[in-house]
Amino acid sequence: MPTALCPRVLAPKESEEPRKMRSPPGENPSPQGELPSPESSRRLFRRFRYQEAAGPREALQRLWDLCGGWLRPERHTKEQILELLVLEQFLAILPREIQSWVRAQEPESGEQAVAAVEALEREPGRPWQWLKHCEDPVVIDDGDSPLDQEQEQLPVEPHSDLAKNQDAQPITLAQCLGLPSRPPSQLSGDPVLQDAFLLQEENVRDTQQVTTLQLPPSRVSPFKDMILCFSEEDWSLLDPAQTGFYGEFIIGEDYGVSMPPNDLAAQPDLSQGEENEPRVPELQDLQGKEVPQVSYLDSPSLQPFQVEERRKREELQVPEFQACPQTVVPQNTYPAGGNPRSLENSLDEEVTIEIVLSSSGDEDSQHGPYCTEELGSPTEKQRSLPASHRSSTEAGGEVQTSKKSYVCPNCGKIFRWRVNFIRHLRSRREQEKPHECSVCGELFSDSEDLDGHLESHEAQKPYRCGACGKSFRLNSHLLSHRRIHLQPDRLQPVEKREQAASEDADKGPKEPLENGKAKLSFQCCECGKAFQRHDHLARHRSHFHLKDKARPFQCRYCVKSFTQNYDLLRHERLHMKRRSKQALNSY
């Protein structure tokens, strides 16, 4: 018969059958030959007891099997195994309310679990609070295991008894953390429980100076709705967030109502039994209303160090905004030498954007000649405006201007911002076009636009007419211009034209040309040769009279060259037609 390691734990007898592993609740037992799920293996691994094995070797082997069925090292990598371990520990440290809900979501990684918790915290109407306790031994549990025997033996007082007993002892730190009240003799083997018991004893000594927060019977809860009474040593173990959480108030699960301090006037009426105890209001009473504030600094039940800590927190709060002192503007501040009429005289001058930009580099210290300060009275405001604008303001009522205003000298409009004033000046300048082009007479509103326009007139014009000497930027413009010179009436002098007209009147109508030849109305001005069509004349001039002009386009089939690529392509098409005919004839 195997022997047990611990004298208090006995190995099962040979006649007795070993205890069967119970399946987790809500899951059917796996059929024989089928591997259990990883979640089932994890729960069996965590719930395994030494008494379920016949000996230490069998217990170790059983733990190896259950751990392998949970972590699956043959499938998962090291990173995935670590992810499963961290996920299990994260779920174990969650509060009971959040833990059960997150486990039901079956997260596969820590990021999914964190996302589920964050989504639950953001859910409206359910302000889950993160209950941060003092350090206690980590017990990994899935949330379905039964309570310990000591916890099951703790009596649960009904709500009615707790509501009636107003002089009950305050809740201690050990009771808040769920630790049972044991005598020191039973805590010799557990050092953590010894520390908790010592904290409980110190807390009992301070109960004479501390009172508890009593709630109505319908809202009584053993942990959530009570102010925790910690000793000075307990308070030193908590961080500032936990100190504020436990010391001021605890937000419950079903109501998100907090009672900030420093508002004694908004406290509700208290009955005779609750004169010195603040009451937490119901959620339905505070919907749509401003939350009242309750101050705990004047309560005699608080420890001195608690009062000091709360005062420090209140000092760190954002103070109310105080009204800035208004600067008094002297009424006799006028631009341009202190004369109130100098403004009207300066408005008659021409205002440019450059003057406005240079006049107000720093708007607080320097003001341009057209930036006026706010005057003392409405009459003084109207006194600084032009007559046209003054009459309109008198008819419409009081002039509402800011401390700093810009007045347009042309129309009298007032602008508060300098940017709008400059934009207004630019719009007026665009409407007026004082700059005229000396070549074509076009009008421009800006001198820079005129300079750019003049550059277009001075651009290079390589195409020059041989008859009159005019230059053109495009060859098409030159060809259209040559049509004027190709007309015979315009080529002849005025006297010859008059003489020819008189001769035609004397002789009568001309006879048609011999051999049925058409009339040649296009004559070359250089050689006198006449052509029937103007394109024939243009070809004649390009071949015979423009030989000195550069011909960069050379034909690859012959020695001819052309001035334009279009003529070269048309010439090469003739070569291609001839070659195609020769190729067809060769077959």
Swiss-Prot record:
InterPro entries: KRAB, KRAB_dom_sf, SCAN_dom, SCAN_sf, Znf_C2H2_sf, Znf_C2H2_type. Keywords: Activator, DNA-binding, Isopeptide bond, Metal-binding, Nucleus, Phosphoprotein, Repeat, Repressor, Transcription, Transcription regulation, Ubl conjugation, Zinc, Zinc-finger. There is a cross-link at residues 13, 403, 496 (Glycyl lysine isopeptide (Lys-Gly) (interchain with G-Cter in SUMO2)). The modification Phosphoserine is found at residues 185, 299. Residues 42-124 form the SCAN box domain. One of its GO terms (molecular function) is zinc ion binding. Pfam families: KRAB, SCAN, zf-C2H2. The keyword ATP-binding does not apply. A zinc finger (C2H2-type) spans 406-428, 435-457, 463-485, 522-545, 553-575. It comes from the Eukaryota. It is found in: Nucleus. The keyword Zinc applies. Belongs to the krueppel C2H2-type zinc-finger protein family. The C2H2-type zinc finger 1, also named C2HR, mediates the interaction with NSD1. DNA-binding transcription factor that can both act as an activator and a repressor. This is Zinc finger protein 496. It comes from Homo sapiens. The lineage of its organism: Eukaryota, Metazoa, Chordata, Craniata, Vertebrata.
